[in-house]
A protein has these predicted regions:
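Short, surface-exposed beta-strand/strand-loop-strand elements in extracellular ectodomains
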Residues: 104-120
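Edge beta-strands of jelly-roll/beta-sandwich modules across compartments, strongly enriched
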Residues: 149-162
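Extended, low-complexity, turn-rich repeat/linker tracts enriched in Gly/Pro/Ser/Thr and Asp/Glu
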Residues: 99-109, 151-154
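Extended extracellular/luminal ectodomain segments enriched in beta-structured repeat modules
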Residues: 87-95, 140
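Gram-positive cell-envelope targeting signals
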Residues: 1-41
Length: 162
Protein backbone atom coordinates (compact mmCIF):
# COMPACT_ATOMS: atom_id res chain seq x y z
CA UNK A 1 0.00 0.00 0.00
CA UNK A 2 2.78 2.49 0.75
CA UNK A 3 4.23 2.00 -2.70
CA UNK A 4 1.03 3.29 -4.38
CA UNK A 5 1.14 6.51 -2.36
CA UNK A 6 4.79 7.19 -3.21
CA UNK A 7 4.84 6.74 -6.99
CA UNK A 8 3.04 10.06 -7.69
CA UNK A 9 5.57 12.17 -5.80
CA UNK A 10 8.19 12.03 -8.54
CA UNK A 11 5.63 13.27 -11.12
CA UNK A 12 4.62 16.11 -8.84
CA UNK A 13 8.28 16.99 -8.26
CA UNK A 14 8.95 16.88 -12.01
CA UNK A 15 5.97 19.16 -12.64
CA UNK A 16 7.16 21.63 -10.02
CA UNK A 17 10.68 21.69 -11.49
CA UNK A 18 9.21 22.27 -14.97
CA UNK A 19 7.03 25.11 -13.66
CA UNK A 20 9.97 26.81 -11.95
CA UNK A 21 12.10 26.41 -15.10
CA UNK A 22 9.32 27.89 -17.25
CA UNK A 23 8.98 30.93 -14.94
CA UNK A 24 12.76 31.49 -14.97
CA UNK A 25 12.86 31.31 -18.80
CA UNK A 26 9.90 33.68 -19.18
CA UNK A 27 11.45 36.15 -16.74
CA UNK A 28 14.76 35.99 -18.61
CA UNK A 29 13.03 36.59 -21.93
CA UNK A 30 11.16 39.63 -20.61
CA UNK A 31 14.28 41.10 -18.97
CA UNK A 32 16.46 40.57 -22.06
CA UNK A 33 13.84 42.02 -24.43
CA UNK A 34 13.02 45.10 -22.39
CA UNK A 35 16.40 45.80 -20.86
CA UNK A 36 19.30 47.69 -22.44
CA UNK A 37 17.12 49.48 -24.99
CA UNK A 38 16.46 46.42 -27.15
CA UNK A 39 12.80 47.29 -27.72
CA UNK A 40 12.35 49.64 -30.68
CA UNK A 41 9.21 51.81 -30.38
CA UNK A 42 10.28 54.56 -32.81
CA UNK A 43 7.99 54.56 -35.89
CA UNK A 44 10.61 56.45 -37.94
CA UNK A 45 13.18 53.67 -37.47
CA UNK A 46 14.09 51.31 -40.29
CA UNK A 47 14.07 48.44 -37.78
CA UNK A 48 11.00 46.47 -36.77
CA UNK A 49 8.76 48.38 -34.34
CA UNK A 50 7.67 46.57 -31.18
CA UNK A 51 4.33 47.49 -29.65
CA UNK A 52 4.01 47.60 -25.89
CA UNK A 53 0.24 48.18 -25.99
CA UNK A 54 -2.82 46.46 -27.41
CA UNK A 55 -5.17 46.84 -30.36
CA UNK A 56 -8.81 45.74 -30.11
CA UNK A 57 -11.05 44.20 -32.75
CA UNK A 58 -8.38 44.46 -35.44
CA UNK A 59 -8.65 42.97 -38.91
CA UNK A 60 -5.61 43.32 -41.16
CA UNK A 61 -5.00 41.66 -44.51
CA UNK A 62 -2.68 42.17 -47.43
CA UNK A 63 -3.84 40.81 -50.74
CA UNK A 64 -2.69 41.62 -54.27
CA UNK A 65 -0.74 44.71 -53.15
CA UNK A 66 -3.58 46.20 -51.08
CA UNK A 67 -3.35 46.52 -47.29
CA UNK A 68 -6.71 46.68 -45.54
CA UNK A 69 -6.76 47.49 -41.83
CA UNK A 70 -9.68 48.16 -39.54
CA UNK A 71 -9.83 48.31 -35.76
CA UNK A 72 -12.03 49.52 -32.92
CA UNK A 73 -9.36 51.13 -30.70
CA UNK A 74 -5.70 50.82 -29.71
CA UNK A 75 -3.27 51.98 -27.05
CA UNK A 76 -1.75 55.42 -27.65
CA UNK A 77 1.34 55.10 -29.81
CA UNK A 78 0.42 51.64 -31.13
CA UNK A 79 1.98 51.08 -34.57
CA UNK A 80 0.58 48.77 -37.26
CA UNK A 81 2.94 48.13 -40.14
CA UNK A 82 3.14 46.42 -43.51
CA UNK A 83 6.11 46.06 -45.82
CA UNK A 84 5.35 47.00 -49.43
CA UNK A 85 7.43 47.27 -52.61
CA UNK A 86 8.19 50.24 -54.80
CA UNK A 87 8.82 49.17 -58.40
CA UNK A 88 9.19 52.63 -59.99
CA UNK A 89 9.56 55.47 -57.48
CA UNK A 90 9.18 58.19 -60.12
CA UNK A 91 5.89 56.90 -61.52
CA UNK A 92 4.21 55.23 -58.54
CA UNK A 93 2.24 56.82 -55.72
CA UNK A 94 0.95 55.61 -52.40
CA UNK A 95 -2.84 55.70 -52.28
CA UNK A 96 -4.51 55.71 -48.86
CA UNK A 97 -8.24 55.77 -48.23
CA UNK A 98 -8.51 56.15 -44.44
CA UNK A 99 -11.45 57.13 -42.26
CA UNK A 100 -11.53 57.59 -38.49
CA UNK A 101 -14.98 57.13 -36.97
CA UNK A 102 -14.21 58.63 -33.55
CA UNK A 103 -11.58 61.37 -33.11
CA UNK A 104 -11.34 62.61 -29.50
CA UNK A 105 -9.58 65.93 -28.85
CA UNK A 106 -5.81 65.62 -29.16
CA UNK A 107 -5.90 62.28 -30.97
CA UNK A 108 -4.28 61.56 -34.33
CA UNK A 109 -3.49 58.91 -36.90
CA UNK A 110 -0.07 59.28 -38.55
CA UNK A 111 1.00 57.48 -41.73
CA UNK A 112 4.76 56.76 -41.79
CA UNK A 113 6.79 55.80 -44.87
CA UNK A 114 10.22 54.50 -43.87
CA UNK A 115 13.03 53.24 -46.09
CA UNK A 116 16.59 53.13 -44.77
CA UNK A 117 17.44 56.50 -43.21
CA UNK A 118 14.54 58.27 -44.93
CA UNK A 119 11.29 58.64 -42.97
CA UNK A 120 8.29 60.76 -43.91
CA UNK A 121 5.05 61.17 -41.99
CA UNK A 122 1.59 62.44 -42.92
CA UNK A 123 -1.28 63.20 -40.56
CA UNK A 124 -4.20 61.21 -41.98
CA UNK A 125 -6.64 61.80 -39.11
CA UNK A 126 -9.13 63.92 -41.05
CA UNK A 127 -8.80 63.01 -44.71
CA UNK A 128 -11.67 64.44 -46.75
CA UNK A 129 -10.62 62.44 -49.81
CA UNK A 130 -8.18 59.58 -50.47
CA UNK A 131 -4.52 60.52 -50.14
CA UNK A 132 -2.24 60.35 -53.20
CA UNK A 133 1.35 60.57 -51.96
CA UNK A 134 4.26 60.73 -54.45
CA UNK A 135 7.17 58.37 -53.78
CA UNK A 136 9.80 60.30 -55.75
CA UNK A 137 12.13 60.71 -52.77
CA UNK A 138 12.28 56.97 -52.13
CA UNK A 139 14.21 54.22 -53.89
CA UNK A 140 12.90 51.11 -55.59
CA UNK A 141 12.57 48.18 -53.21
CA UNK A 142 11.02 47.46 -49.85
CA UNK A 143 9.35 50.25 -47.86
CA UNK A 144 7.80 50.12 -44.38
CA UNK A 145 4.29 51.58 -44.36
CA UNK A 146 3.16 52.28 -40.79
CA UNK A 147 0.11 53.69 -39.07
CA UNK A 148 0.80 55.24 -35.66
CA UNK A 149 -2.43 55.25 -33.66
CA UNK A 150 -2.84 58.00 -31.05
CA UNK A 151 -6.35 57.78 -29.61
CA UNK A 152 -8.47 57.49 -32.76
CA UNK A 153 -11.17 54.82 -32.84
CA UNK A 154 -13.32 52.97 -35.39
CA UNK A 155 -10.73 53.21 -38.16
CA UNK A 156 -10.92 51.65 -41.61
CA UNK A 157 -8.13 51.96 -44.15
CA UNK A 158 -7.07 50.73 -47.56
CA UNK A 159 -3.49 51.44 -48.60
CA UNK A 160 -1.73 50.50 -51.83
CA UNK A 161 1.22 51.51 -54.01
CA UNK A 162 0.44 51.85 -57.74
Amino acid sequence: MENKKMHHKRYIAGGMVSLVFMIVCLTGLIVSASGAGNVNTDPSSDERVWNLGVIQMSVSNYWDGVWNLSFKRASDGFVEERNMRIEDAEAQKLYADISCGTVPDGSSLILWLVQGDKAESVDVTDLSEPLEYPLEGFEEGKIHVRLQINGVEDVTSEITIQ
